[in-house]
Swiss-Prot record:
GO terms for cellular component: inward rectifying potassium channel; membrane; plasma membrane; presynaptic membrane; protein-containing complex; sarcolemma; synaptic vesicle membrane. The gene is Abcc8. SMART domains: AAA. Residues 1-30, 90-106, 154-169, 320-356, 455-460, 558-576, 1032-1067, 1162, 1266-1281 are extracellular. Mg(2+) binds at S720, Q775. This is ATP-binding cassette sub-family C member 8. The keyword Transferase does not apply. It is found in: Cell membrane.
Length: 1582
């Protein structure tokens, strides 16, 4: 057929110009083409020449991006313009098809306008990103011309009586409005930027973030199209496929998204609430108001997007209704009644009655709906992430001010705080993500019910009633599910606590043969957890079942009721399949209801917990002595605003205040020079708990400035508490603590600024920083150097001096990377002595004028202690006139003290110089004298020089390298370093980018067993086959309903027609019932499979780990093992089953849908191939990026949580150093790193979902177009068309879920892979060569030990730590073993228990070679006390006798021997008194005494003490030594000496050096030899 612009009819009115050219419709249309052609000719050269060249691309970088005024409005108007132009094109084609003649002018101008609109926005984008607004003048001209020409057309339409009944008139009016608005936007740009018509144009710089090329998260800065489609992520996803993603690849957060910005916003909201409500500033209601005030605006935006998306979602059912209804009726040819300007214009009704138009509108509605939905998700998640970062920062700042009593003995534990950070902040984040559903769900339900009623009539209310009535059941199931999850979490936490204790004390458990006891303890808790998990699985399966069964049941009841009770009503395919789609939409919000309710409840609980935490007590700042105000410019760097304690009711403390009222207003003593003291306490009463009895009573001390002060006393007398009270960490009941404010804070630090004072605290200025080394060393998860310098500038000379003073150089030399080696997990890669020395080195390195050292010698031998005292404390500190306060048990150092404070039972016994004690406390002084009895200075210097002689250090524990004798040969250093690097998993994090093998999936499924796996696969396939059969039968049924309608059925008997309907209804009922039953079977099978696998894997893992050799625990970080039991087991328990169910369901649904569409229209397969290729590459690129981003999200969260845990653990140290601001800055960096990873992961998920849903929309369009074509040619029934379209919509819904679940499953299977890796760990050989019947029951009854040519190593790849050792120990002998650090003392003791590889020689005990004994028998018949005390949470009785073999009298006897009987009797419950985790409610010395008592309980004939008295004062140690010698007179005792004087009374003394026996004789004989090494040790220890 010939084509012509104005039509092929010569007599057409389109050619007439007798009434003027503007009255000619074709001319007006041609006139409308002119502006578009103008724009194309002007802009194309600029785009292709200016921005198309490679040189120009170099200059267009995101650093020049900015948004012109009206940016978003322009893009929105352009999108609307494009939509209206598409409608105009379609309207023109339809209008042109009515007549025989073809009129190109009906749609060609609209096509040109469409191209021009796209060109205009591309042109605008390039100009905007290059910040060159003068070229916008072309757009100004274009919008002006387009507005004028379109207005002329609109006026001419009006003149020719073309009105609202014609769609062309409405579209033209809309175009006039749109062009006018775009013209106004362009004029506004001129007004604001003044780039033309003004003399002084305004220069606008791009955002500050874009000037920083490190900012790579560009979502806030890109144009609206890129925001909606995440187009800017394309380059990132492509790069991620080529190389791994790391923190450098994702860059930094924009300023507006950083934790500090959001924290400040939250603080402003809190301040605003505080001004409104002064009563409950931190209450839960105030927190909710503050959160809404700070982040509510973005939440409203997300909710708006969500409501728009939900409303657009109803376009699918309506378009299906229209298309199928159109195809189900006879084709009607519209006879033109009236022609205007020579052509016929279709009406709106005719336009929407066209099936192809509806298909295109459905496609566009799906695109827009998916875009709005993903925008809602993104905005909500971004808001939640920002909120999480703000709350985490607020929690951290609160921690910095938290009262120590809340952490040590109060209501707040470190675990609770970490849960608050890790769990509760995430609960709030996810609540904000689900929050838009709260008001979107009612809208969706109401609209859905109205549309169902419109389509089905009254019968629709039946199905809606079924869904709504079942909503309470869903809520009940969700509530039970939440309860089961909470119960599971409680048992899981208890199991992890027990597992953590078991792993931390694994050495003790193996030495005592208690593995099975603690393993059974964990398994008992696991059984309780599995019971709760079964309930969780049951309710999960019910929830899954209801999600899939409710739509089937609602459709069944509705359709059967519809044809049964309303026989004359319409049951055509259009009604049935539109209703089916509406039911699926209606069910969705009811499914979400349970999740939203659970999330809301969890958020309410989390906010309540947050409120309680923020309201907890804070520390006080101590007073400073009055001084002259400092100059204004000399404010101290660490000066902090004084803090106020939250008032509480403390009856016990108030009573003390009443008694000590006169002490409330005190000033420092003015005896002598006012500046001769550093700290002064007057009448101080201090307590840990708010309502407790004071731990320290009537404390009045004066610590001199620039001198060495020592605090001494017995175990538990309050020495460490006195230091903490001085630092302001204890609750002060009464009295006063004064810091000399004339002391400069540190080198380069000025005194505090008095202008920071408040009226309420005029005398409570802050003290300066104090270098503090706690008794329990606190190390950062950082390098050795970073732990020592501790954020201070690196000074090489000072650093070397500190390293030498702490004798750390030999230990550093043996580390894999020297002082750049990562140490973490509380320093578990290092020995106790090394941790202690690094902690002390930190205090020595700092430039503070005040240094507090809390028992720094407890874990050091005599040589290291003497060297640290001489080179560190005396030379580096005291000689530098720094104030040093030293808590110690080593009384031999008292002569060095300038001032001594003696404590007893929480009070000051006396303070003064050593001479003062000699004069006034003669008895105490004589007691000290007998303990210290030092030699002259010449001998001391000789000993120090001897200690400086070079020897290979063996200080590094077995976890790092060869340990003993490792560096004897220099040529093996490289081999050793390589091995250490391989063993040390903390030295470097290797990014595992390799794809997780699907063998892990096979291992997971095979763990379920072949029967359960077969049932799982068969039930899933059968269920989806039945679901397809249900919908196919519905199509057949509705097609028959068309034939059997009253107008067309032509039945002779109405009973025959009713019979046909009943047969269809009956078969439909059977299929639906079968489908519901299969839904139940599949949901139960999936959860049962998950339970069985979880139970089997955990049991295998626990049994394998508990039997692993000690070498495994020394070379594998504890956190890595614990993560297998925590996060990986949790993934297998709760996440993999649900992911597996979702993956199988979404995959089978997509396959079913594509199969049905291909069956309905086979030509669809042609279009399916390219779509499948695109889909494959999208998912391939996404899975790589998603896996990397997910791992990055997890790995960046670990340092954040670790930083919180480190801060809580080292809070006293941080506050003592005044490093709060530095640690807060690190927190912000960690939070931003985690948030940027989370945001990129969110953007990547949205990138995938937008593309997958766009592909789904394409599937719908192609399926609709092909179905319509086949139906119009009478090759396809309307029912099958409805079936195909319904399944096409299903593809668009489930395609992205399939890829997302595939990526999630790939990540989650990593947990299975990691656990199976641990299952390959080789176990210890517990079996013995001797049968149990051949071992005497009372073996060993004598205690005779023969050591024959014994050589020991820790691993077959390592060097020996003991070489050719021979010794004979007679029954009942007391053997003392000494030697320098690394000489092999501990290895010697471990050899008795076969904890090391005895590759040569043997040990014979009472005639039996221990290598032939079963390990459990051997270890249960010996006793050992380790250097590091290990206590478990539980009762004292459990800690002493977990096997429950001993009577109470035996336990009390052991406590009496250990000097603990009085302490335990004073506790509530006595033997049943509770010991907290790690024994934190007892001092370090008391914990060691409990370990001694535990060993005494066993009453074995061989007793080994491995530096067991390191944390005990000398007086108590001497008592214990006497008791041991008396109580164990008939037993063989092997003592590894911490203080050499403790083995002077031994029968024999063994001196080890480099793994060999250097000396082995009676102590008297060795002391008589002048050149004896043992004699030199004794002289050094005096």
């Amino acid at each position: 057929m010939p084509l012509a612009f104005c039509g092929t009819e010569n007599h057409s009115a389109a050619y007439r110009v007798d009434q003027g050219v503007l009255n000619n419709g074709c001319f007006v249309d041609a006139l409308n083409v002119v502006p578009h052609v103008f724009l194309l000719f002007i802009t194309f050269p600029i785009l292709f020449i200016g921005w198309g060249s490679q040189s120009s691309k170099v200059h267009i970088h995101h650093s020049t991006w900015l948004h012109f005024p009206g940016h978003n409005l322009r893009w929105i108007l352009t999108f609307i313009l494009l939509f209206v132009l598409v409608c105009e094109i379609a309207e023109g084609i339809l209008s042109d098809g009515v007549t025989e003649s073809r009129h190109l002018h009906l749609y060609m101008p609209a096509g040109m306008a469409f191209m021009a609109a796209i060109t205009s926005v591309v042109y605008y984008h390039n100009i905007e990103t290059s910040n060159f607004p003068k070229l916008l003048i072309a757009l100004l001209i274009y919008w002006t011309l387009a507005f004028i020409t379109k207005t002329i057309k609109f006026v001419k339409f009006y003149d020719h009586a073309i009105g609202f009944s014609q769609l062309r008139f409405c579209l033209t009016g809309l175009l006039v409005i749109l062009y006018g608005m775009l013209l106004l936007v362009e004029v506004n740009v001129i007004r604001v930027r003044r780039y033309v018509f003004f003399k002084t144009p305004r220069e606008v710089k791009p955002p500050e973030d874009l000037q920083d090329l490190g900012v790579r998260f560009l979502q806030p800065f890109v144009n609206l199209l890129s925001k909606g489609t995440y187009w800017w992520m394309n380059a990132f996803i492509k790069t991620a496929h080529k190389k791994p993603i790391d923190l450098r690849a994702i860059g930094k957060l924009p300023i507006a998204m950083r934790a500090l910005t959001n924290y400040q916003r939250l603080c402003l909201a809190f301040d605003a609430q505080a001004r409104k409500d002064t009563q409950s500033q931190q209450g839960a209601r105030a927190i909710w108001r503050a959160l809404c005030h700070a982040f509510g605006r973005r939440l409203v935006l997300s909710s708006t997007f969500r409501i728009l998306a939900d409303l657009l979602g109803f376009a699918g059912p309506l378009c299906i209704f229209g298309i199928v209804d159109h195809l189900g009726k006879e084709n009607h040819v519209f006879q033109p009644k009236t022609q205007f300007l020579g052509v016929y214009f279709v009406s709106s009704q005719e336009f929407l009655g066209n099936a192809y138009v509806l298909a295109v509108l459905l496609f566009l509605a799906l695109l827009l709906q998916r875009t709005f939905l993903q925008a809602s998700y993104y905005v909500a998640i971004e808001t939640g992430i920002n909120l999480r970062g703000a709350i985490q920062t607020k929690i951290y700042n609160k921690i910095m001010h938290l009262s120590t009593s809340n952490l040590s003995m109060g209501e707040m534990t470190a675990g609770q705080i970490c849960n608050l950070v890790a769990i509760d902040t995430n609960q709030l984040m996810w609540f904000f993500f689900l929050c838009p559903n709260l008001w979107a769900m009612p809208v969706q339900i109401i609209v859905g019910v109205i549309l169902l009623y419109y389509i089905l009539g009254v019968s629709a209310l039946i199905g809606a009633a079924v869904i709504i009535l079942l909503a309470p059941v869903q809520y009940f199931v969700a509530t039970k599910l939440s309860q089961a999850q909470r119960s599971t979490l409680e048992y899981s936490n208890e199991r992890l606590k027990q597992t953590n204790e078991m792993l931390r004390g694994i050495k003790l458990l193996k030495l005592y043969a208690w593995e099975n006891i603690f393993c059974s303890r964990v398994e008992k808790t696991r059984r309780k957890e599995m019971t709760s998990l079964r309930a969780f699985a049951v309710y999960t399966s019910i929830s899954i079942f209801m999600n899939t069964a409710i739509p089937i049941a609602a459709v069944l009841i509705t359709f059967v009721g519809h044809v049964s009770f309303f026989k004359e009503s319409d049951f055509s395919p259009s009604v049935a399949f539109a209703s089916l789609s509406l039911f699926h939409i209606l069910v969705t919000p009811l499914f979400l209801l349970s999740s939203v309710v659970r999330s809301t409840v969890k958020a309410l609980v989390s906010v309540q917990k947050l409120s309680e935490f923020l309201s907890s007590a804070e520390i006080r700042e101590e007073q400073c002595a009055p001084r002259e105000p400092a100059p204004q410019g000399q404010a101290g760097k660490y000066q902090a605003v004084p803090l106020k304690v939250v008032n509480r009711k403390r009856p016990a403390r108030e009573e003390v205040r009443d008694l000590l009222g006169p002490l409330q207003r005190l000033t420092p003593s003015t005896d002598g020079d006012a500046d001769n003291f550093c700290v002064q306490i007057i009448g101080g009463f201090f307590t840990w708990t708010p309502d407790g009895i004071p731990t320290l009573s009537n404390i009045t001390i004066r610590i001199p400035r620039g001198q060495l002060t020592m605090i001494v006393g017995q175990v538990g007398c309050g020495k460490s508490s006195l230091l903490l009270a001085t630092l302001g960490e204890m609750q002060k009941v009464s009295g006063a603590v004064f810091w000399n404010s004339s002391l400069p804070d540190s080198e380069g630090e000025d005194p505090s600024n008095p202008e920071r004072e408040t009226a309420a605290d005029s005398d409570a200025r802050s003290r300066g920083p104090v270098a503090y080394a706690s008794q329990k060393p606190w190390l950062l998860n950082a390098t050795v150097e970073e732990n020592i310098t501790f954020e201070s500038p690196f000074n090489k000379q000072r650093y070397k001096m500190v390293i030498e003073a702490c004798s750390l150089q030999p230990d550093i030399d043996i580390l894999p990377h020297g002082d750049q080696t990562q140490i973490g997990e509380r320093g578990i890669n290092l020995s106790g002595g090394q941790r202690q020395r690094i902690s002390v080195a930190r205090a020595l390195y700092q430039h503070t004028n005040v240094v507090f050292l809390d028992d720094p010698f407890s874990a050091l031998d005599v040589h290291l202690s003497d060297h640290l005292m001489q080179a560190g404390i005396l030379e580096l500190l005291r000689d530098d006139k720094r104030t040093v306060v030293l808590v110690t048990h080593k009384l031999q150092y008292l002569p060095h003290a300038d001032w001594i404070i003696a404590m007893k039972d929480g009070t000051i016994q006396r303070e003064g110089t050593l001479k003062d004690f000699q004069r006034s406390e003669c008895q105490l002084f004589e007691h000290w004298k007998t303990l210290m009895n030092r030699q002259d200075q010449e001998l001391e210097k000789e000993t120090v020089m001897e200690r400086k002689a070079p020897e290979p250090s063996q200080g590094l524990p077995r976890a790092m390298s060869s340990r003993d004798g490792l560096l004897l040969d220099e040529d093996e250093e490289e081999e050793e370093a390589a091995e250490s690097e391989e063993d040390d998993n903390l030295s470097s994090v290797l990014h595992q980018r390799a794809k997780i093998p699907w063998r892990a999936c096979t291992k997971y499924l095979s763990s379920a067993g072949i029967l359960l796996l077969s049932l799982l696969v068969f039930s899933q396939l059968l269920k989806h086959m039945v679901l397809v059969a249900i919908d196919y039968w519905l199509a057949k049924w509705t097609d028959s309903a068309l034939v059997l309608s009253p107008a067309a059925r032509n039945c002779s008997l109405s009973q025959e027609c009713a019979l046909d309907q009943s047969v269809y209804a009956m078969v439909f009922t059977v299929l639906c019932s079968l489908g519901i039953a299969l839904c139940l079977v599949t949901s139960v099978t999936v959860e049962w499979t998950g339970l069985k696998v979880a139970k089997r894997l955990h049991r295998s893992l626990l049994n394998r780990i508990i039997l692993a050799p000690m070498r495994f625990f020394e070379t594998t970080p504890l956190g890595s093992i614990l993560n297998r039991f925590s996060s990986d087991c949790n993934t297998i328990d709760q996440h993999i089953p649900s992911t597996l169910e979702c993956l199988s369901r979404s995959t089978l649904l997509c396959v079913s849908a594509l199969a049905v569409i291909s069956y309905v229209t086979p030509v669809f397969l042609v279009a399916l191939l390219p779509l499948a290729v695109v889909c494959y590459f999208i998912q391939k690129y996404f899975r790589v990026a998603s896996r990397d981003l997910q791992q990055l999200d997890d790995t960046t969260q670990l340092p954040l949580l670790s930083h919180f845990a480190e801060t809580v653990e080292g809070l006293t140290t941080i506050r003592a150093f005044r490093y709060e601001a530095r640690f807060q800055q690190k927190l912000l960096e960690y939070t931003d790193s985690n948030n940027i990873a989370s945001l990129f992961l969110t953007a990547a998920n949205r990138w995938l979902e937008v593309r997958m849903e766009y592909i789904g929309a394409c599937v719908v369009l192609i399926a609709a177009a092909t179905s319509i074509s086949n139906s119009l040619h009478r090759e396809l029934s309307a029912g099958l068309v409805g079936l195909g379209l319904t399944y096409a919509l299903m593809v668009s819904n489930y395609l992205n879920w399939m890829v997302r679940n595939l990526a999630d499953m790939e990540i989650q299977l990593g947990a299975v892979k990691r656990i199976h890796t641990l299952l390959k760990t080789e176990a210890e050989s517990y079996e013995g060569l001797l049968a149990p019947s051949l071992i005497p029951k009372n073996w060993p009854d004598q205690g005779k030990i023969q050591i024959q040519n014994l050589s020991v190593r820790y691993d077959s790849s390592l060097k020996p730590v003991l070489k050719h050792v021979n010794a004979l120990i007679s029954p009942g002998q007391k053997i003392g073993i000494c030697g320098r650090t690394g000489s092999g003392k501990s290895s010697f003791s471990l050899a008795f228990f076969r904890m090391v590889d005895m590759f040569e020689g043997r040990i014979i005990i009472d005639g039996i070679d221990i290598a032939k004994l079963p390990l459990h028998t051997l270890r249960s018949r010996l006793s050992i006390i380790l250097q590091d005390p290990v206590l478990f949470s539980g009762t004292i009785r459990f800690n002493l006798d977990p096997e429950k073999k001993c009577s109470d009298s035996t336990l009390w006897e052991a406590l009496e021997i250990a000097q603990l009987k009085l302490v335990v009797k004073a506790l509530p419950g006595g033997l049943d008194a509770i010991i907290t985790e790690g024994g934190e409610n007892f001092s370090q010395g008391q914990r060691q005494l409990f370990c001694l008592a535990r060993a005494f309980v066993r009453k074995t004939s061989i007793f080994i003490m491995d530096e067991a008295t390191a944390s005990i004062d000398m007086a108590t140690e001497n008592i214990l030594q006497k008791v041991v010698m008396t109580a164990f007179a008939d037993r063989t005792v092997v003592t590894i000496a911490h203080r050499v004087h403790t083995i002077l009374s031994a029968d024999l003394v063994m001196v080890l050096k480099r793994g060999a026996i250097l000396e082995f004789d009676k102590p008297e004989k060795l002391l008589s030899q002048k050149d004896s090494v043992f004699a030199s040790f004794v002289r050094a220890d005096k």
